Amino acid sequence: MLSLHQLQFNIEQRNLFNLNITFLPSSITYIKGANGSGKSSLLRMISGIMQPNSGNIYYKNNNINNIPKPYCTYIGHNLGLKLEMTVLENLKFWSEIYNSSETLYAAIHYFKLQDLLDEKCYSLSSGMQKVVAAARLIACQSDLWLLDEVETNLSKENRDLLNNLIVMKANSGGIVLLSSHLESSIKSAQILQLV
């Protein structure tokens, strides 16, 4: 369970949000809102990268400030790839951080990355870099996924693979929060609208 208690974020004297909400296991939530409404900031706060002006975030009934990192898998605008490293080196790096090396090859096969393993990430298109970042969702075992505009620049095939993966995560008890400008293609997802 993920709970936001009186989570407030202000920017330039403007209150972007003041949230009290709980996300239950087995849930998918799209965070929607105009540019500048705080979607990315909210995901960054939940990941622990950014601090709110006030309020608390609890994951599994523990304040995230007291939980050892990493407790979630966050993919933001900066994909977290080491561009000078190969696809395989990047996925190994992340799977070792999460102590989940047994899922590394499942990630490679799910997203059909076998032919790209020795490619440096800087040589990949932005869409393929996002696919490598999305493969991290399998390579890194975590029950909380925070995805910021990950669907952008993906081919239809890779977007479908990602959406199926998101549904599988929720069906296995995970919590998935994602922001997207694209129309929600996961019918079971909830919508959190930021104004």
Swiss-Prot record:
Catalytic activity, reaction form: heme b(in) + ATP + H2O = heme b(out) + ADP + phosphate + H(+)
SUPFAM superfamilies: P-loop containing nucleoside triphosphate hydrolases
InterPro entries: ABC_transporter-like_ATP-bd, ABC_transptr_haem_export_CcmA, P-loop_NTPase
CC annotations in GO: plasma membrane
Entry keyword annotation includes Transport: yes
Protein EC: 7.6.2.5
Keywords: ATP-binding, Cell inner membrane, Cell membrane, Cytochrome c-type biogenesis, Membrane, Nucleotide-binding, Translocase, Transport
Topological relation to the membrane, as annotated: Peripheral membrane protein
First-level EC class: translocase
Record-annotated ABC transporter domain positions: 1-195
Leader sequence residues: none
One Gene Ontology MF term: ATP hydrolysis activity
GO biological process: cytochrome complex assembly
Annotated residues for binding of ATP: 33-40
Pfam families: ABC_tran
Function, in words: Part of the ABC transporter complex CcmAB involved in the biogenesis of c-type cytochromes; once thought to export heme, this seems not to be the case, but its exact role is uncertain. Responsible for energy coupling to the transport system.
Assembly mode: The complex is composed of two ATP-binding proteins (CcmA) and two transmembrane proteins (CcmB).
NCBIfam families per record: ccmA, PRK13541.1
Record-given protein name: Cytochrome c biogenesis ATP-binding export protein CcmA
Species of origin: Rickettsia felis (strain ATCC VR-1525 / URRWXCal2)
Native organism taxonomy: Bacteria, Pseudomonadati, Pseudomonadota, Alphaproteobacteria, Rickettsiales
